[in-house]
């Protein structure tokens, strides 16, 4: 993309933001009166117009705490006029039947170590709201503070070490709420993407390890987001971001996308995330990316006084591709192979004894030739930026995988979940950590991801594991 076209994209988006904010603000300025307003000399005894009814909060018409990816708390613990606090603690233990000697788990954006108790996430912060000004901050301490930046290759371009600058922040943005329609929010910073249905925070989810269409797609975007609520059943988001789950920009163009969410009643939620354009391959400015992610959730049973108090189903389908820069979406050749992502996941959730217990069965599958969304195995310290010769991601390299899981939750209160989960994952190529692990004897050696003389990582085609976790949210 030429600089002229890039400037045009940014300029058009800026014009949209300015138009929306100016239209939303019109009539709200102090001293502004409509042209047909009565004059100051009007009869003071005339009846005053009734105060307009308060607008309903978005999606507050029903209880959506049953949704996968949505907090099940019915009200916040810390709630004050200008601040709603939030504390999250996620601690886990993973027992991997492959027994990697270096205790390193491969292929998960949620878990990284085995046979140890690990703090995955400690988040402290909340939402600030005063006079229509809004902001959100949530910290990111624990395993996430190194795993999440490691999957972002953009800090390798340029200076100031973006991976360290942002590693302790999961969400941080500020913006303004306009009282138009059912609300318009304009925010800038780091915000959750929810491409892939599951939440970044395990407390909100039906399962701990989501399938590939969630685990391999973005958890966050860094940029500008506009949320438009025409009514309390519908939301449209517009994104202008640095790129595909990236702190910085991979090349010379921003990522552009939208989210559409419709909840017609309390039993259905229909979501579509669409990433229309991005140039998200480091050092390959000719390669472009598009991706579509659609989910539907259906609560098909709600009988609070029965043994099964609730039942719900979720289905997610993803399709996307890369084109240009040596690859094509379809109809590839050996010289210019097809490079795409297609996958699905399906989960069924049951609640028992007035929602005190939960049981989830689910899984999914992907096909991702070129491996452009496959998480890089951390062989000899490899990152998304470094890559590794032990597991290539060249155009056309095949990767097909499937997984299944069974999850049992004990939820004695709205603030804690005790979770137990069995997972099995399988791929067409060796990918998961085997008994020999992925770390050279004596630790990482040389540059991240580089070859080590005499060392060969132990990668296997399948993995089965058990996870136990305590998930707390205040």
Where do the language-model regions lie?
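Outer-membrane beta-barrel pore domains
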Residues: 56-58, 111, 148, 157-162, ...
